[in-house]
Regions:
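Conserved alpha/beta enzyme-core scaffold
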Residues: 1-437
C-alpha cells in the first residue's frame, strides 16, 4: 500500500507539540550511539519546569544533549544509562541524578521487556519509502523493536541524513507513530583514530591469527584501524560483530570481505550498532549486504558460534596475572560498560576454528610517569569483565599468548612476559611472595 502525502502530514507536528506526549513519571528512551534524537531531546529540555520525575534512558551517545550536560534548579531529569560514553560521564560529573545498569548486551531485550520498560520512545529514523516505511538507521535495529513492544507512545524524528539500513525487523511504518517531527542534523560521527607505534606492534601480533575465510569482530579505535589495514591481503573474510566500524567497511569496499564462507548468514555483514564517518554511513544506505541485528542476536554466543573461524578482538583497561580483564571500570570508577566482551569471548571460542583475543598496550604514561596495565591485583572494587576461566589469547606489544588451559603458574609467567620490561621484576617478586610461581 503506497503512502499518501496525508499519511505523513497527519502525523507531522512541531517538536514542542510532540514532547507534550511526555507526562510526569515517564521513562523516556532518547537513543543510543549514532541513533540519537537531538530535536526531540532539546524540546524536552525546554519543558524542564513543567514536568516531574522523568527518567531519561540511553547508551553511549555520540552527541551531547542538554538533558545531560546542563543543570537547572529543580529540573526533573534523571539519567539511566546502559553504556557510559563521554556525555553520560559528563552528566554524572556535573551532578545529574544518574544510574548505570551493568548487563551483557545479549541481555538487552530481556532488560527492556522485564525491568527497563519505557513509557515513551524517541526514534531517530530515515525518511519513509513509497509505502510509508522508515528504517531505524545505522544503529536503531539493535534495540528499537524491544522498546516498541512495551512503549505507550512512539515519536519519530525523521532525518534525510539517516541511511536506510536493512536488517532484523528494522522497518517501521509511519502510521504506527503517535507523532512525527523533522530533523536535518548530521548523523554524529566517531573518528576511528590513527594507530600509533605501539598499536602497530600489537596488530602485528594479532593479524597472523586471522586466516582467509575468517569471520571477524572488531571495535573502534587505532587498533581496529591497524588490524584492518593489515587484512587487505586476506580473502573471503566475513563480518559478525557487535559494532560496524570504518576499518570493516574499507575491507568490504576492497573486496576482502565477501561473507561467502561464514556458514551462518552468508552474504551478510551482521552487526548491532555502527559508529564511523559520513563515508561509512553513505555506504550503508540501501546496501543489501549489510544487516543490522538485535543486540540479543548479534551478541548471543549461540549465534556467534555459528560463524566459522570466528575471530573476536576486544580490548581492556587492565589485565591481572590470572588473565582476568577489567574492561569497563577500575576500582569504584565506572568508565564505560562490559558491552559484548564476554558474549564474543565465549561465542568465538565455541566457533569451529574460532579464537578470542584480548589486546591492549602493556602500559600507559600519566603526568610523565609510566604505569603498568598488567596488574598483580586490581584496585579494590574493580569488577571482572572476562574471568580467567574464559580468557584465551592475550596480546600486547610484547607478544600474543594463548592462556587457555595453562596452569596458574604458567599463566602468571606468560602474563609477566607480556608486561612492559620496567614492571616484570616487580610483578615476578609479588607473584613469588604469594607462591603463584
Amino acid at each position: 500500500m503506497e503512502m499518501t502525502k496525508n499519511d505523513l502530514k497527519n502525523k507531522l507536528t512541531s517538536p514542542e507539540e510532540a514532547v507534550k506526549l511526555v507526562h510526569d513519571h515517564d521513562r523516556v528512551f532518547i537513543g543510543l550511539v549514532s541513533n540519537i534524537t537531538p530535536v526531540l531531546s532539546d524540546a524536552l529540555w525546554e519543558r524542564r519546569h513543567e514536568l516531574n520525575d522523568i527518567t531519561i534512558i540511553s547508551g553511549l551517545l555520540l552527541r551531547p544533549t542538554r538533558l545531560y550536560t546542563e543543570l537547572a534548579e529543580n529540573q526533573p531529569f534523571k539519567m539511566l544509562s546502559l553504556f557510559l560514553g563521554p556525555f553520560e560521564r559528563t552528566a554524572m560529573k556535573i551532578g545529574r541524578p544518574s544510574a548505570f545498569t551493568s548487563l551483557h548486551l545479549s541481555q538487552v531485550d530481556d532488560w527492556f521487556h522485564n525491568i527497563g520498560k519505557v513509557s515513551v520512545v524517541f526514534i531517530s529514523a530515515s525518511m519513509p519509502d513509497e509505502n510509508g516505511n522508515v528504517s531505524f538507521g545505522v544503529s536503531g535495529g539493535s534495540v528499537y523493536r524491544f522498546l516498541l513492544d512495551t512503549a505507550d507512545r512512539i515519536i519519530l524524528e525523521l532525518n534525510p541524513n539517516m541511511p536506510y539500513v536493512y536488517g532484523q525487523d528494522n522497518i517501521f511504518n509511519i502510521n504506527d507513530a503517535d507523532a512525527i517531527v523533522m530533523s536535518d542534523k548530521a548523523i554524529p560521527e566517531m573518528a576511528e583514530g590513527e594507530p600509533d607505534e605501539i598499536t602497530e606492534k600489537i596488530s602485528n601480533q594479532i593479524v597472523p591469527l586471522i586466516p582467509d575465510g575468517a569471520t571477524i569482530q572488531l571495535g573502534i579505535g587505532g587498533l581496529s584501524s591497524a588490524i584492518g589495514s593489515k587484512l587487505t591481503d586476506k580473502n573471503d573474510l566475513g563480518i559478525f560483530s557487535e559494532m560496524l566500524c570504518p576499518s570493516m567497511v574499507k575491507l568490504m569496499k576492497n573486496g576482502n570481505v565477501t561473507n561467502k564462507y561464514k556458514g551462518f548468514m552468508d552474504g551478510k555483514s551482521v552487526y548491532a550498532f555502527a559508529a564511523g564517518d559520513k563515508a561509512m554511513y553513505d555506504f550503508m544506505d540501501h546496501n543489501e549486504n549489510i544487516y543490522n541485528a538485535y543486540f540479543s542476536f548479534a551478541n548471543d554466543p549461540r549465534m556467534i558460534m555459528k560463524n566459522k573461524k570466528m575471530i573476536s578482538i576486544n580490548t581492556a583497561m587492565a589485565i591481572n596475572l590470572y588473565g582476568e580483564t577489567a574492561a569497563d571500570a577500575i576500582g569504584y570508577h565506572q568508565y564505560s560498560a562490559i558491552g559484548g566482551q564476554l558474549d564474543y569471548v565465549r561465542g568465538a571460542q565455541w566457533s569451529e576454528g574460532g579464537k578470542s583475543i584480548i589486546a591492549m598496550d602493556s602500559s600507559y604514561i600519566k603526568n610523565g610517569k609510566r604505569y603498568s596495565k598488567i596488574n598483580f591485583t586490581f584496585p579494590e572494587g574493580t569488577p571482572i569483565s572476562t574471568p580467567r576461566s574464559d580468557i584465551e589469547y592475550v596480546a600486547t606489544e610484547y607478544g600474543c599468548i594463548d592462556l587457555k588451559h595453562l596452569t596458574m603458574a604458567d599463566r602468571v609467567r606468560a602474563m609477566i612476559s607480556l608486561a612492559h620490561p620496567d614492571f616484570r621484576d616487580e610483578l615476578t617478586e609479588k607473584a613469588r611472595h604469594v607462591d603463584l610461581i
